[in-house]
Curated annotation (Swiss-Prot):
Functional description taken from the UniProt entry: Protein S19 forms a complex with S13 that binds strongly to the 16S ribosomal RNA.
Listed GO biological process terms: ribosomal small subunit assembly; translation
GO MF annotation terms: rRNA binding; structural constituent of ribosome
SUPFAM superfamilies referenced in this protein's UniProt entry, alphabetically: Ribosomal protein S19 (SSF54570)
InterPro entries, A to Z: Ribosomal_uS19, Ribosomal_uS19_bac-type, Ribosomal_uS19_CS, Ribosomal_uS19_SF
One Gene Ontology CC term in the entry: cytoplasm
Name this protein carries in UniProt: Small ribosomal subunit protein uS19
Length: 92
């Protein structure tokens, strides 16, 4: 179920202040963040965020196509190593 339109997008407050400081300073640094649930806003375009996936901060460069999505969508939390090999066929 989608979020109500009248509520507006959810963004943690500290993200807005951090993004503002980086824009004012003109630096192109990675903004470390743990809020995977926050929505990507148009003012974040061009910035790079380090989205925490439970292990490390994954760098995510924000483009216009990402606006409206959540940060967590671009930092996968699970690694797939493939299915285990068949032990019976290995013995022979």
């Amino acid at each position: 179920m989608a979020r109500s339109v009248w509520k507006g997008p959810f963004v943690d407050g500290y993200l807005l202040t951090k993004a503002e400081k980086v824009r004012e300073g003109g630096r192109n640094e990675v903004i470390k963040m743990w809020s995977r649930r926050s929505t990507i806003l148009p003012q974040f375009v061009g910035l790079t965020f380090g989205v925490y996936n439970g292990n490390k901060h994954v760098p995510v460069s924000i483009s216009e196509e990402m606006v409206g999505h959540k940060f967590g969508e671009f930092a996968p939390t699970r690694t797939y190593y493939g299915h285990g090999a068949d032990k019976k066929s290995k013995r022979k």
